[in-house]
Amino acid sequence: VRVLIVGNRGDADPGLVGTRLSEVGFTFERNEREYPREWKSLAGIDVVVLLGSEWSVYWEGNEKEVAAEVDLVHTAMKRGVPIFGICFGAQLIAHALGGSVTRSQTPEVGWHDVSSTAYPDVLSGSWLQ
């Protein structure tokens, strides 16, 4: 399975998610958010992973990069390529699908227990620790 990972240049390491995907035999291509003109195409890509970022989709100054990533989401959806977003990546998917992303009145940071009744094995392993 080939995964396209989109992240910021200095922070494009897929971390524990990448470790787990590698353990099950997935391979990666990487696109750096700051350079959408240099992005690899979706040809042969089975899954898109949008990593977190210090950016927000509503920030001024990164509109072109956000628009390029929104286009990538739309193209992946049209081709039936699954998309997984982490933090900023999830914001971007919501934005691309017409949702609103706004600044919170107060910061929200914390760790929460997550469980799945439908797919209990998906949460096992070090990648979600």
Language-model segment annotations:
Residues 97-129:
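Pocket-forming structural segment of enzyme catalytic cores
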Residues 9-10, 106:
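Short coil/turn segments
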Residues 18-84:
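Flexible gly/pro-rich beta->alpha loop and the following alpha-helix that scaffold active-site loops
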Residues 1-4:
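Extreme N-terminal starter segment of soluble prokaryotic enzymes
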Residues 75-100:
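Catalytic nucleophile loop
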Residues 11-16:
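Short N-terminal binding/cap micro-motifs at the start of the first secondary-structure element
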